[in-house]
Structure formats: C-alpha cells, structure tokens
UniProtKB/Swiss-Prot annotation:
PANTHER family: P2Y PURINOCEPTOR 12, P2Y PURINOCEPTOR-RELATED G-PROTEIN COUPLED RECEPTOR. This is P2Y purinoceptor 12. Receptor for ADP and ATP coupled to G-proteins that inhibit the adenylyl cyclase second messenger system. Required for normal platelet aggregation and blood coagulation. Gene3D superfamilies: Rhodopsin 7-helix transmembrane proteins. Residues 57-67, 125-148, 214-239, 305-347 are cytoplasmic. Residues 321-347 are annotated as: Disordered. One of its GO terms (molecular function) is G protein-coupled ADP receptor activity. It comes from Mus musculus (Mouse).
Length: 347
C-alpha cells in the first residue's frame, strides 16, 4: 500500500524508481504544516473516539447496525494511534529506525484500518437502506451472528493482504536518512504493493457505489413518505435530508479525492512513468488528500451521534451524570435499553 508521508532518500532529494535520476523536492510543507495538522487530528480524534468506544461498549450488540459501528470505532482508534509515528517521521524528529518502523508497520496499519472503515461504512449504508424500507423489522440472532462473522472476515481479509507489505519491507537502508518506503521493499514487495493498491481501489469503488445507490434509494423512499404525510406536518424533511448528506459528504470529502490521486501516485513510486515535476506534484496531492482520509476518524463520531439513538441517548446520559449523579442510573438505562420503538434512526 502507499506509505503516508514517507518519501525521501535524503533531506531534499529522491531518485525516480527504476532510474538514477536525481529529483529535488521541497519538504518544508510536509515537515512543518502536515505534522501540525496531524497533531490536531490526533488529539481531537483520540478524545472523540475514546469517548465513542466507551459509549458503544456499554451498549448491547442487539443489531447489525451496532455491530458495524463498534467495528468502525475500533478501526478509527487504531488509525489514530499511528499518527504520532507519522508526525515524528515527517517532522524529521526520529532516527532511521523510527522511519523504518513507519514504513514497515504503522503506515501499513494506517491503510489497513482505512479500508476496514470504508468497508463497514458500506455495510452501515446497506443496513440503513434496509431499515428505511423495513423500519419495524428487528435483527434475529442468526442475522447478528452473520454480522459478526462478516466483521471477522473483513478484518481477516485486510490483515492477510496487509501482512505481506510488512514482511516484504525487508531491505536494509543504505543511508541512515532513507525514508522512501519503496526503497525498503524487495522486488516482489513492490509488485505486491501495487497489487494491494488495486485491490483497495476495488474495495473503495464498490463501497462508493453502495453509498450512492443506497442513499439515492433512501432519499427517494423518504420523499415518497413525505408526500404521503405532508398534510399532517409531522415529517421533519429538512432534518432527514441533513442526515442523508452527512454520510455522502463524509465519503466525498474524506475518501474520493485520495482515490483519484492514489493510482498515479503509486505508479510514480513503483515505475519510471513520470518526470520529476510530475512526481513532486503527485506527492503533494497525495499528502493533501491523505490528510482528508485521516479526517474521517474525527468525523465518524458525528455520524454515530446523528444515526444512532442509543449512542445519542447514552451520550446525553453521560453528560447529565456529570451534573447530577442522582439521575445517572435512570438515564443510563434509558440510553442503553430505551423504551423507544427503535434503537437507531433509519438514516
């Protein structure tokens, strides 16, 4: 997989893959600006996702929706834990062994968790579509078991295709300042790197289509419902539309730009198909869009809040507990077990 932000052979130069052409690159932006941006994401994401994990693991896994959300929280938190290594490496604050660790472990983990999050977002979208068309259907034990098995399969599949990227990053750097991860990969490691890139592209575009198709159908269904009931003035149309566009906005902002830039950038790392100027441009585009994918870990908690009643009620209960311990037991029970007809909102 691509390696986030680790791309130099020395302070300001690199060699094009397969050639001995020296390519000068200005790293001031990646050494100063991006470490600051990732530091902001790290603290914001660590706080919000730790809180989200605490809340979700107080909620019983009584629906496919909750199961998928819990997996997303774990994935986001793992991604966030890779940020400090990237920050130190990009800012040139770590020694050579740290940069090798980034190439071999933490950058691979970053992409591993990214595509797990994308996969579960696709499953959540399908679940929301089914919930909209069949709002009163509850999850049976067999459905819950199927959701758990599917979750394990996703984690196992991504781990199996990611592990070789760690193992095949096994060349010793000739220079202590070498941080371009492609130089640390074996010949087959470069081939596998490219193969996994295309696999991940397929994963993304499948889930992209799922999000577009399902939410188009959801919007159509909600509009029909609105037309049927608009006389009663009970349908919060504007609120529902906001919920629809939260998912689409997050997907477009965080993931689409990076996946348009990823294939040409990977080719620039593994093949001599671009000149120096193009390689530098692709590098800056990749770094910028990669930061947007990292932003997803901070935006997902907002999705949990708007889509999941159990999460929203538990958060409200937790906030009330900070002001009044006398009502904590009642609020917690309401948040987790709820007397509402559904534990989550359809959208």
């Amino acid at each position: 997989m691509d390696v986030p932000g680790v791309n130099t052979t020395s302070a300001n130069t690199t060699f094009s893959p397969g050639t001995s052409t020296l390519c000068v690159r200005d790293y001031k932006i990646t050494q100063v600006l991006f470490p600051l941006l990732y530091t902001v994401l790290f603290f914001a994401g660590l706080i919000t996702n730790s809180l989200a994990m605490r809340i979700f693991f107080q909620i019983r896994s009584k629906s496919n929706f909750i199961i998928f959300l819990k997996n997303t929280v774990i994935s986001d938190l793992l991604m966030i834990l890779t940020f400090p290594f990237k920050i130190l490496s990009d800012a040139k604050l770590g020694a050579g062994p740290l940069r090798t660790l980034v190439c071999q472990v933490t950058s691979v983990t970053f992409y591993f968790t990214m595509y797990i999050s994308i996969s579960f977002l696709g499953l959540i979208t399908i679940d929301r579509y089914l919930k909209t068309t069949r709002p009163f259907k509850t999850s049976s034990p067999s459905n819950l078991l199927g959701a758990k098995i599917l979750s394990v399969v996703i984690w196992a599949f991504m781990f199996l295709i990611s592990l070789p990227n760690m193992i095949l990053t096994n060349r010793r750097p000739k220079d202590k300042d070498v941080t371009k991860c492609s130089f640390l990969k074996s010949e087959f490691g470069l081939v596998w790197h490219e193969i996994v890139n295309y696999i991940c592209q397929v994963i993304f575009w499948i889930n992209f289509l799922i999000v577009i198709v399902c939410y188009s159908l959801i919007t159509k269904e909600l509009y029909r419902s609105y037309v049927r009931t608009r006389g009663s003035a009970k349908v919060p149309k504007k609120k529902v539309n906001v919920k629809v566009f939260i998912i689409i906005a997050v997907f477009f902002i965080c993931f689409v730009p990076f996946h348009f830039a990823r294939i040409p950038y990977t080719l620039s790392q593994t093949r001599a198909v671009f000149d120096c100027s193009a390689e530098n441009t692709l590098f800056y585009v990749k770094e910028s869009t990669l930061w947007l994918t990292s932003l997803n870990a901070c935006l997902d908690p907002f999705i949990y809040f708007f889509l999941c009643k159990s999460f929203r009620n538990s958060l409200t209960s937790m906030l009330r507990c900070s002001n009044s311990t006398s009502t904590s037991g009642t609020n917690k029970k309401k948040g987790q077990e709820g007397g509402e007809p559904s534990e989550e909102t359809p959208m």
